[in-house]
């Protein structure tokens, strides 16, 4: 039953209750039968399960297989388990980093529970009792007054100037006036939650007045429960980076298996026999190639680079809760933003007025309100009245001083039916009454007006001026209040509205609005320059939403605004045809937000969703990246979000997008560097195998992959953003990891380094034997190891820019210089410390040989620079041809 469409008597009958409430026995029976009034939460994942989930990554699985094979070979050959220990250490470190960043349990449901009131005042058998809110049942009569949290969903049966703050549920920035009358459905199929004026909902707060309601839904059956259910069922999809790394892992897996099988077959054919020793030797060479092809440090490097991004973002007030969200921001194409508290300040403010004397008008409005102000100017109270008191304060009028001078002696509280409020105050010569409320209602009760300090009879011309001023303010989406006064010789004999609110003297209008955050317009402009589409989704009225959207540049030519009711009337097919033209959604419900986000995602757009209310949580979790507000945001939203804005500043999102783009650029540099290194190792080992000698052992490759390469790779992750990073269109989230020519770069750079390494092996072999014979040589292996290490160190500087010359970059990367020095020192230590050199089967290296290795390795810089220059020239040529065409 839709209780908001039924009379209160019908509702009471349907829930088998009465105006006196339930008996204690019946309440207990219902509690036992239906359960407690709380939100259920799914069990969280144990820490050990989260740890093992890190092992599901294909790259990690490859490493574990490599460790297992190395362990078996170590047992068979009686050698050390150094390879196994090194690989498992890498896996363990990566898993710990992943768990550390992502092990925060999902607390959205717990936060929802915390929003519930701890206890409630209810009628049981006609007697007022206080019971824990968890023990409320359908049929209970709950009493509400200002400051109370609504403990469950209910149909109002009494209301006295009751206003409910529902921003967390609906996005409506102004408390909603409530009444007990049934609602008329009209032509609409249903009434949006924000317009159900005779209902109260769990999670909202009483802002003003008092009332009572019969409970119609508890626990998971409430509107809050529906949100909790949607939140628990929402699934986290993979981020673009996760998808790309997963694809890369699969490519590497098949590549490793294919090349290893080829090398194994070539070795067997070269040997000409099939005994155990030959098979084992061939298998060992194949394993060496597998170790060479697998970038053991890649998973850890990406995790650490993302972690560094998390730290950098936190310094810019963007708190990342989900590690991979750092990168996802970089390819965001759509930002669906809540209005209240996100684009606006969530603080009603008077911005315009019409009347004879602004100070006198503000004083009257402040006196005819129940909001209060302290000595510091901080205002508390219902938002609309708080705006009036704050307006007076800005004009130098302290309400406390006004109250002391004009003592209130009687009043007619605000009532949603008559839309007015009146207060009467003592003066030296009698009393003065101030009445404020809806302009059309108040104007009809005025027989005079004030102009230039004189009271004049109301005329049609002046009435027209007031109506035009009202229309002008309303057209700007301002909430307009009118004010009038009346003089009394003595205290009125009655405080009934019918007696007080007549023969009034009109004094003016004021227009207020929840103003936009001052930095948001610039942030949205920057978003558009970066190719990001901003969308406003709000529970507020469509006129208000559209006006603010136009002011901010969200609603532009060719786009329009719709309401949630209009959206509900569209089928999925119809919506899919028009959603790209809609920039503003007003009066929406939670399921609408999720539908909007899903429509953009289904069309292939990487979508972010910002918000602060409970109503935003399901859509935040459904989006590619959910952005919660740290100050005004509810715990529910913050728990569901991937990122939380510590300063609630929309502009922080732009900074986070820039950081996300920088991080992704740097991750690509890391991947290209590490894969290029592995490519050179694969080519070197494959070529050496074909020529009949062993160039490097598995332990050498592990050292290069995990020590020599990882330090520079991490430093590349700290590279500064390129100047045009926020002028680019968002990258295609579906583009492969090798897009933009990176695959070709990896291959040619691998060939260059492998050529230098093979040359160094021959030089070392010649220095040891005096011949160029192609045989195994410990000295040649040592030289090859040194040269590969040096070449990778030098090559890391090439990777600072994919196409730009390293000699033209605007700034240096101090971290890269330090990491290069650290890698050089580590390489020297492993060659010079006798115990390590013996473990790696290295021979002594002279200064001349060090110089030769450094010189040969350094050749990678001029070679890559020449290729980059050719690539830039080709790109310019293609661009000029395109312009000519």
Per-region residue spans from a language model:
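Generic alpha-helical transmembrane segments
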Residues: 708, 781-796
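Conserved cytosolic headpiece of P-type ATPases
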Residues: 1-730, 737-738, 751, 766, ...
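Outer-pore turret/helix-boundary of cation channels
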Residues: 278, 774-775
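Membrane-water interface at loop-to-transmembrane-helix junctions
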Residues: 732-751, 775-783
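A C-terminal functional module that forms or caps the active site or interfaces directly
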Residues: 799
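Membrane-interface interhelical connector segments
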Residues: 769-772
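Core segments of transmembrane alpha-helices
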Residues: 680-681, 745-757
């Amino acid at each position: 039953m839709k209780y908001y469409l039924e009379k209160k008597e019908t509702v009471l009958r349907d829930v088998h209750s009465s105006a006196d409430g339930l008996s204690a026995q019946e309440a207990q029976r219902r509690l036992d039968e239906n359960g407690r009034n709380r939100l259920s939460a799914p069990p969280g994942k144990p820490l050990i399960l989260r740890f093992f989930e890190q092992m599901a990554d294909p790259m990690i699985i490859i490493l574990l297989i490599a460790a297992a094979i190395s362990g078996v070979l170590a047992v068979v050959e009686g050698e050390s388990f150094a390879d196994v220990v090194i690989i498992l250490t890498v896996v363990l470190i990566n898993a710990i980093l992943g768990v550390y960043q992502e092990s925060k349990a999902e607390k959205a449901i717990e936060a929802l529970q915390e929003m519930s009131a701890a206890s409630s005042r209810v009628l049981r058998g006609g007697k007022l009792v206080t019971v824990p809110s968890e023990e409320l049942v359908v049929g209970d009569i709950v009493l509400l007054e200002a400051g109370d949290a609504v403990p469950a969903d209910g149909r109002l049966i009494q209301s006295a100037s009751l206003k409910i703050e529902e921003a967390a549920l609906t996005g409506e920035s102004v408390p909603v006036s409530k009444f007990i009358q049934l609602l008329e459905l009209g032509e609409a199929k249903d009434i949006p939650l924000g317009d159900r004026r005779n209902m109260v909902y769990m999670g909202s707060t009483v802002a003003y007045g008092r009332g009572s309601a019969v409970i119609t839904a508890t626990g998971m059956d409430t509107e809050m429960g529906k949100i909790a259910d949607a939140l628990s069922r929402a699934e986290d999809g993979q981020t673009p980076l996760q998808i790309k790394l997963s694809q890369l892992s699969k490519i590497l897996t098949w590549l490793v298996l294919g090349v290893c099988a080829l090398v194994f077959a070539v070795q067997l054919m070269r040997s000409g026999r099939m005994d155990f020793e030959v098979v084992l030797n061939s298998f060992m060479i194949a394993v060496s190639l597998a170790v060479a092809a697998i970038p053991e440090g890649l998973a850890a490097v990406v995790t650490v680079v993302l972690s560094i991004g998390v730290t950098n973002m936190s310094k810019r007030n963007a708190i990342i809760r989900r590690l991979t969200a750092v990168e996802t921001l970089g390819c965001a194409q759509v930002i669906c933003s809540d209005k209240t508290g996100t684009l606006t300040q969530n603080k009603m403010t008077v911005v315009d007025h019409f009347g004879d004397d602004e100070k006198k008008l503000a004083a009257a409005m402040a006196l005819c309100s129940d909001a209060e102000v302290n000595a510091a100017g901080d205002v508390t109270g219902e938002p609309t009245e708080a705006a009036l008191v704050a307006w007076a304060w800005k004009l130098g009028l302290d309400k406390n001083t006004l109250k002391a001078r004009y003592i209130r002696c009687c009043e007619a509280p605000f009532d949603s039916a008559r839309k007015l409020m009146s207060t009467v105050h003592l003066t030296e010569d009698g009393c003065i009454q101030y009445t404020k409320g809806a302009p059309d209602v108040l104007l009809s009760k005025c027989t005079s007006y004030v102009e230039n300090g004189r009271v004049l009879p109301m005329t049609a011309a002046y009435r027209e001026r007031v109506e035009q001023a009202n229309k002008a303010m309303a057209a700007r989406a301002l909430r307009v209040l009118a004010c009038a006064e009346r003089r009394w010789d003595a205290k009125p004999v009655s405080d009934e509205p019918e007696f007080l609110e007549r023969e009034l003297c009109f004094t003016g209008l004021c227009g207020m609005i929840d103003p936009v955050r001052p930095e948001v317009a610039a942030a949205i402009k920057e978003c558009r320059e970066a190719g990001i589409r901003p969308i406003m989704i709000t529970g507020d009225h469509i006129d208000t939403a559209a006006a603010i959207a136009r002011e901010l540049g969200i609603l532009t030519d060719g786009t329009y605004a719709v309401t949630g009711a209009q959206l509900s009337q569209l089928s999925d097919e119809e919506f899919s045809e028009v959603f790209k033209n809609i920039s503003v959604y007003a009066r929406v419900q939670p399921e609408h937000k999720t539908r909007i986000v899903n429509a953009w995602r289904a069309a292939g757009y990487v979508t972010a969703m910002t918000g602060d209310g409970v109503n935003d949580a399901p859509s935040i979790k459904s989006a590619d990246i959910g952005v919660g507000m740290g100050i005004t945001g509810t715990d529910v939203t913050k728990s569901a979000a991937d990122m939380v804005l510590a300063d609630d500043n929309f502009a922080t999102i732009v900074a986070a997008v820039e950081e996300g783009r920088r991080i992704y650029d740097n991750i690509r540099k890391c991947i290209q560097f590490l894969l290029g290194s592995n490519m050179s190792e694969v080519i070197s080992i494959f070529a050496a195998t074909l020529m009949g000698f062993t160039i490097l052992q598995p332990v050498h490759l592990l050292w290069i992959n995990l020590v020599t390469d990882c330090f520079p790779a991490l430093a590349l992750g700290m590279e500064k953003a390129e100047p045009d990073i926020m002028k680019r269109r968002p990258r295609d989230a579906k583009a492969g990891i090798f897009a933009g020519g990176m695959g070709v770069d990896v291959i040619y750079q691998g060939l260059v380094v492998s050529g230098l390494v093979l040359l160094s092996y021959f030089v070392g072999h010649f220095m040891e034997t005096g011949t160029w014979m192609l045989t195994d040589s410990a000295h040649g292996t040592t030289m090859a190891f040194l040269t590969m290490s040096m070449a990778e160190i030098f090559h890391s500087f090439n990777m600072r820019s994919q196409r730009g010359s390293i000699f033209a970059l605007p700034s240096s990367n101090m971290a890269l210089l330090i990491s290069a020095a650290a890698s050089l020192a580590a390489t020297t230590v492993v060659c010079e410390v006798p115990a390590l050199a013996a473990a790696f089967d290295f021979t002594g290296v002279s200064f001349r040989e060090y110089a030769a290795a450094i010189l040969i390795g350094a050749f990678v810089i001029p070679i890559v620079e020449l290729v980059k220059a050719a690539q830039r020239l080709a790109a310019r040529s293609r661009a000029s041809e395109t312009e000519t065409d």
